[in-house]
């Protein structure tokens, strides 16, 4: 994209056609909403803004380092009803299976379905709709700072981490606060700024691991707050002959190298010959690419001896599993997605929680309410903290934890628990699946740490 001085306005035309006319203005452009980051969270928020009748005329600026999206991730989730992105669902399953040493179980998921959406389909659908809206503008750039402005003083810092820098931003209390977003060669102001810009890239796992190590550098292992990565490498494999039962999603197969942590294979059949097969690990540090590939090669060779296949797509990533705040903000800047603590800390599940967070934000904007981005209730946050403590301090193998939970409960109950929608009685049934002598001391330590 050519670089011009001044403020850049990309007209609402196909987002890939970034050579559209760019208008230059000597004054800072002002928008009702600025969305910093056009990933899953940023584009989900944009989608719900476009669906809200009272907000459709609001001016919106979406900023991302590139709008040339790739199929960089796969989102899976479960729900009972049609989702906001039901037309994008590539596959769904009504039966899952769990496997561990000496344990194999198939579980019907009714009334839930387990669903898959490919990242590229999601990106393209939202951006295609957005390009038809004259009130939505796009800026392709790397953001260098996000700051709070007010009517009485210049900007101070907010604790917003960008890919290239970490800004510490605290604004003074005053009326008519606005926020300023800056990038090389330009800036814009917004009445609200919603940022999902992480200080690392999820698909560059080495930068992710370096970031988490830097957060608690110098802290003794006993005093570290739990921070694990759900890191993975997956392949879409296509066999020459039918080998998969397309009706069953293999949610967790723990019969793989555990890497001194919690590791499992994730197998989602797209049809009888094709599946996404993903090696997933919960641990403090990530592996080399060769290590993921070695396990994937061995798993496929053992599971499908003599069969031939080709790899049509691969993906790699790291999702933070922690309750450490990745950013602290003040109005009118708000964090969303992983940066805004939307991810469920004990499992890394994100898509449905991001949808809930973004829908809540738009509902608050619609009703003129103060913006609250928190979505995880206190009870389920406590459960997450306890499970994280057990996994982080290796009090019990993750394979045994999940085997016990799925062995003694229906899949629908587990899904409700993992979705933070379970009742207290259902929670008790889940807890009864796990050894008290391990989880009770962990719960006490979590309570003492929070006191």
Q: How would you label these PLM feature ranges?
A:
Residues 108-128, 283-291:
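Short beta-strand to alpha-helix junction loop
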Residues 31-58:
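N-terminal Rossmann-like FAD-binding beta1-loop-alpha1 element of flavoenzymes
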Residues 1-32:
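Extreme N-terminal leader/targeting segments of oxidoreductases
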């Amino acid at each position: 994209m050519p670089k011009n001085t001044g403020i850049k306005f990309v007209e609402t035309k196909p987002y890939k056609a970034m050579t559209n006319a760019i208008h230059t203005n000597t004054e800072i452009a002002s928008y009702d909403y600025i969305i910093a980051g056009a990933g899953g969270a940023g584009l989900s928020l944009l989608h719900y803004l476009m669906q809200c009748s009272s907000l459709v005329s609001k001016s919106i600026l979406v900023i991302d380092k590139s709008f040339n999206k790739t199929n960089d991730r796969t989102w899976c989730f479960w729900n009972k009803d049609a989702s906001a992105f039901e037309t994008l669902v590539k596959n769904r399953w009504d039966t899952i299976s769990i496997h561990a040493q000496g344990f194999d179980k198939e579980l019907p998921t009714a009334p839930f379905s387990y669903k898959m959406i490919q990242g590229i389909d999601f990106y393209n659908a939202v951006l295609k709709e957005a390009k038809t809206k004259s009130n939505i503008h796009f800026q392709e750039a790397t953001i260098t700072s996000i700051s709070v402005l007010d009517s009485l003083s210049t900007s101070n810092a907010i604790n917003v981490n960008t890919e290239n820098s970490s800004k510490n931003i605290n604004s003074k209390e005053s009326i008519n606060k606005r926020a300023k977003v800056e990038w090389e060669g330009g800036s814009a102001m917004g009445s609200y700024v919603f940022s999902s810009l992480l200080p690392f890239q999820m698909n560059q796992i080495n930068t992710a691991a370096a970031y988490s190590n830097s957060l608690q550098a110098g802290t003794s292992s006993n005093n570290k707050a739990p921070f694990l990565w759900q890191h993975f490498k997956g392949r879409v494999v296509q066999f020459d002959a039918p080998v998969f039962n397309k009706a069953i999603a293999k949610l967790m197969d723990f019969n793989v190298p555990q890497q001194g942590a919690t590791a499992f294979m994730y197998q989602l059949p797209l049809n009888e010959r094709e599946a996404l097969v993903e090696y997933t690990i919960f641990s403090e540090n990530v592996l080399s690419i060769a290590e993921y590939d070695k396990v994937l090669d061995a798993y496929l060779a053992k599971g499908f001896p003599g069969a031939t296949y080709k790899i049509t797509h691969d993906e790699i990533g790291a999702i933070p599993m922690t309750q450490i705040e990745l950013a602290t903000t003040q109005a009118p800047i708000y964090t969303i997605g992983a940066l805004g603590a939307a991810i469920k800390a004990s499992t890394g599940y994100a898509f449905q929680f991001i949808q809930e967070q973004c829908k809540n934000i738009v509902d608050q904007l619609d009703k003129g309410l103060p913006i609250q981005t928190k979505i995880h209730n206190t009870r389920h946050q406590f459960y997450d903290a306890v499970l994280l403590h057990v996994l982080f301090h290796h009090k019990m193998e993750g394979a045994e934890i999940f085997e016990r939970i799925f062995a003694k409960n229906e899949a629908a109950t587990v899904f409700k628990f993992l979705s933070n929608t379970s009742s207290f009685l259902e929670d008790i049934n889940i807890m009864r699946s796990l050894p008290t002598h391990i989880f009770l001391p962990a719960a006490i330590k979590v309570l003492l740490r929070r006191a």
